[in-house]
UniProtKB/Swiss-Prot annotation:
This is ATP-dependent Clp protease ATP-binding subunit ClpX. InterPro entries: AAA+_ATPase, ATP-dep_Clp_protease_ClpX, ATPase_AAA_core, Clp_ATPase_C, Clp_protease_ATP-bd_su_ClpX, ClpX_bact, P-loop_NTPase, Znf_CppX_C4. One of its GO terms (biological process) is cell division. Zn(2+) binds at residues 16, 19, 38, 41. Residues 4-57 form the ClpX-type ZB domain. Keywords: ATP-binding, Chaperone, Metal-binding, Nucleotide-binding, Zinc. ATP binds at residues 122-129. It comes from the Bacteria. Pfam families: AAA_2, ClpB_D2-small, zf-C4_ClpX. The lineage of its organism: Bacteria, Pseudomonadati, Pseudomonadota, Gammaproteobacteria, Pseudomonadales. Belongs to the ClpX chaperone family.
Amino acid sequence: MTDTRNGEDNGKLLYCSFCGKSQHEVRKLIAGPSVFICDECVDLCNDIIREEVQEAQAESSAHKLPSPKEISGILDQYVIGQERAKKVLAVAVYNHYKRLNQRDKKADDVELGKSNILLIGPTGSGKTLLAETLARLLNVPFTIADATTLTEAGYVGEDVENIIQKLLQKCDYDVEKAQMGIVYIDEIDKISRKSDNPSITRDVSGEGVQQALLKLIEGTVASVPPQGGRKHPQQEFLQVDTRNILFICGGAFSGLEKVIQNRSTKGGIGFNAEVRSKEEGKKVGESLREVEPDDLVKFGLIPEFVGRLPVLATLDELDEAALMQILTEPKNALTKQYAKLFEMEGVDLEFRSDALKSVAKRALERKTGARGLRSILEGVLLDTMYEIPSQSEVSKVVIDESVIEGKSKPLYIYENSEPAAKAAPDA
């Protein structure tokens, strides 16, 4: 029935049949058979439908678990090299979520354990990026924690349960979603025991944190304050079961290769001793591939903690060729990102191959891996990004080796200019 109230001159004042607003209170009133609907109600209906569609898509994608090969293939789009680590991660993550998908089905006598992961590799080799990409691929909540900020409960610093609180924040405190999430704990090697021998002094940021993390990683019900804040007795807590949360720990473990080499090298004295030259020494990545749980214990992790991380994946050091690939090949490659920024100003950005090689060399010298690439490019392009928005006539910027080495300025090519391009003005 048409909703009309109080006549107006020759016509009747029309009202929305859903919210009751008059035609003067809304921008548009759409007529139907004996009903009217305003533009505000149409927008509200669209929002409701959009939310339901997104939830249905998320639910269907959660049930469809990609195979290990598919997981590895997607990782290839973002992470260069590290094939062995990708394979280990793909299998471990696939088995973990396969276990979760089967948990509601008819149980038998076989109980599948959780396979938490330990990533070992040099700085800038892709540990964090691998974990982030996995979480994005699986559409699950993901958070990163820094092990160096953690302390035992009762001491100044972050409590280990703050990790779960961060995970809850990522999914708007939806406990069910959080219990299916992934937690990446970085710098895990920094909480190694300070010495092999137990000390009478309390190690609240080393072995103490390992002890505190044990139950959380293995599986426990953590009490987390709602909406953050510190705990107090009168407060209600959110109960989060961590049994199904996948924990990935990562660290550079600098010096671990020496522990491995000492174990694997058979020493001797006298005429029968084996003499090794320095050239025969293995690269760090090659040594790390031979890591065993006992090596991690000697490094400073307690045996119980090592036992909670049954899946080990090692990452290799990135060489010059790999760094050049990282600059150009991944979906989110740095050269593509900067080219996009310049494109927004209507300018083409070109990196010559010798420039990319020079950037890779400088990153190797800094020993920061892929992490150092952005800071190098940011420094090189700073003046150009400062000038370009004020120079509408520039159509292209060319970066070569001499620019990276600081010997010359980037080459600016102007619209309607002759083939010989002008050099960039001094800053």
